[in-house]
Amino acid sequence: MRLFLNNEEPRAKSFDTYAKEVVSFGAGKHSESFKKNGSYVTMACPKCHRKITFEYYNNDGIGSFRCKNCGHSGSEKADYSVENTDFERRKFTLRGTEFRMPYDTPYMLYNYSAAVAVAEKFAGIAPEDAAKAFDTFKNVGGRFEILRYKGKTIKYMRIKQENPETLQTSINVMASDSERKMVCLGLCPLVDLITHYANTF
C-alpha cells in the first residue's frame, strides 16, 4: 500500500509505519511561518501521547515538529516540498520547477504539494507539466473566493470548523492581510444530530 502523507502534520505523519511506500508532501519555512510561546497548548504525540514541540508553524498544528519522548517527527524535507514561497509574486518552486500560486494563503501550499505528488506518483505527470495546470486552476466555489463588487475586493472563506485549528488558521489568514478590511464572522453552533447515526430500531 502507498500512502501520501503530510510531512508536517503529526497525526497524518504517524501513519508512516503502516504502508510499504510513503510519499510525503509539505512546505518549507516561509515568510508567513510563525512561532508560539510556551503558553500555547500543543497537541499530544499520536504515537506515545506525550507533548510535541514545534520549531515553527506554517499553519496551526502544522510545521516542523518533534516529540522529545519517542522521536516522532517529520523528515527534514518532504519528498514533494513547496520551497522559495513568494506570496507577493505568487510563486513557489517544487522539485526544481517554478509554479504560479493560484491562492496566496499558507494552508493552500499543502494542497499544492499533495496535488503534484499524486499527479506524478499516481498518474505519471511530471512537475513541469503539472505546473501548467496551476495557471488556470480555480478552487471549488464556496470555500475560498475572491470577488470584486463596486470597486471593493471581497475575500470569502468558508470553513467546516472540524477543529479549533481550522478556525484559527482562517483568522491568521485574515490577520496577515495588511490591507484595511472589515471582517464578518458567522459561527454556526455544532449540534449533535444523534438520530442521523444512532440505531433507532
Predicted regions and their residues:
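N-terminal alpha-helical interaction blocks
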Residues: M1-Y18
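Short beta-strand segments
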Residues: N6, G26, C184-C188
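Short, charged/polar "capping" segments at the starts of alpha-helices
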Residues: E9-S14, S31-S33, V191-H196
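Extended acidic/charged loop-beta regions that coordinate divalent cations
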Residues: K13-R100
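A conserved, hydrophobic alpha-helical segment in the catalytic core
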Residues: I62-S75, Y103-D135
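Gly/charged, well-structured mid-domain segments that form the phosphate/adenylate-handling core
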Residues: T85-F87, A119-I159
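A short glycine/serine-rich beta->alpha loop
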Residues: E98-P106, K155-Y156
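Active-site beta-alpha connecting loops in nucleotide-dependent enzymes
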Residues: V140, R158-F201
